Curated annotation (Swiss-Prot):
Disulphide linkage map: none
Primary gene name: rps2
Organism of provenance: Oenothera argillicola
UniProtKB keywords: Chloroplast, Plastid, Ribonucleoprotein, Ribosomal protein
Protein name listed in UniProt: Small ribosomal subunit protein uS2c
Primary location recorded for the protein, binned into one broad class: plastid
GO MF assignments: structural constituent of ribosome
NCBIfam families xref list: rpsB_bact
Organism classification: Eukaryota, Viridiplantae, Streptophyta, Embryophyta, Tracheophyta
Subcellular location(s) of the protein: Plastid, Chloroplast
């Protein structure tokens, strides 16, 4: 895998609060190699290691994108929902930014059936066929469509399991992470000081609570994916 320059700046990461971890009482000892210090009862993440792992992740997604691989971005925190959707759409990735439905990946046949139903309902809505149904029937189907849009809207074009899953909060998205582990799908995870780095294929030690931190990490990964996709177009 070729190493590239991704303009990862330690000062920029400090300004975004990437280095702030959790209180020392709320930590996972397996994170010790990634912790630089304890300041006023708060663990401080070693940003040099963050930069190294983030660069590795950018190299990985660039190479994967240049080979046409499919990505799924998972971040269901309410405050990050819009950010996740924008970033994923920009990089032409699938995403889940509401609730993770258990079995979304491990029970793919059921998810696929729901997606077919979702696409059919969208077609019926676009062609106006829903409005030609009796009001009660139309109302029921519109509620179904709204529900499917909320939870499956970000994966509506997904036709198979993703090649790489990017997880923005290991604790919050634990079910998604376990499904990836079960299926052997590689994961890139933001890991705060209360996380288990051994569960991720490629961990990025970083603050997973601050929006500025999440935005910075996600923007770097999305930029690398976009560059990889452009590379495949330039060099088919």
């Amino acid at each position: 895998m070729t190493r590239r320059y991704w303009n990862i700046n330690l000062e920029e990461m400090m300004e975004a609060g990437v280095h702030f971890g959790h209180g020392i009482k709320k930590w996972n000892p397996r994170m010790a190699p990634y912790i630089y210090a304890n300041r006023k009862g708060i663990h401080i993440t070693n940003l040099t290691k963050t930069a190294r792992f983030l660069a590795e992740a950018c190299d990985l997604v660039f190479d994967a994108a240049s080979r046409g691989r499919q990505f799924l971005i998972v971040g269901t925190k309410k405050q990050a929902a819009a950010l996740v959707a924008r970033a994923a759409i920009k990089a032409r990735c699938h995403y889940v930014n509401k609730k993770w439905l258990g079995g979304m990946l491990t029970n793919w046949s059921t998810t696929e059936t729901r997606l077919h139903q979702f696409r059919d309902l969208r077609t019926e809505q676009k062609t106006g066929r829903l409005n030609r149904l009796p009001k009660r029937d139309a109302a029921i189907l519109k509620r179904q469509l709204s529900h499917l849009q909320t939870y499956l809207g970000g994966i509506k074009y997904m036709t198979g399991l993703p090649d790489i899953v990017i997880i923005l909060d290991q604790q919050e998205e634990y079910t998604a992470l376990r499904e990836c582990i079960t299926l052997g799908i590689p994961t890139i995870c933001l890991i705060d000081t209360d996380c288990d780095p051994d569960l991720a294929d490629l961990p990025i030690p970083a603050n997973d609570d601050a929006m500025a931190s999440i935005r910075l990490i996600l923007n770097k990964l999305v930029f690398a994916i976009c560059e990889g996709r452009s590379s495949s177009i330039r060099n088919p």
